[in-house]
């Protein structure tokens, strides 16, 4: 009986050790995946404004042409959310560029940001809706 108890204890210890190694490896793999792949980033209007001032970014307005013409962030490129499908948008030729995406309220910008990531863009930041933009807007014409 003592021998069976020792055998059981050794087996349990081996099993615990092996499963611990497997869990540790899975965590490492997940961390590597996260650094290798592009990820969705939600930021505030203030953070987006700071990024615009301090680095080279492409500001992407995913609203309709009418909404864009009514007032948009200066230098924003119009790429309506509905136009983003399985093809890379012509207005966004560089998949390595840092994209700052916005719409009116934040719903379309999230959807568009996720579609752009799926198309292979690497650095996509959603800063929500223009209704939360405390800075100046420009109008065409």
Regions found by a protein language model. Give the residues of each.
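Rhodanese-like catalytic fold shared by cysteine-dependent sulfurtransferases
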Residues: 3-9, 17, 21-46, 51, ...
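Structural scaffold elements adjacent to functional motifs in cytosolic proteins
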Residues: 59-61
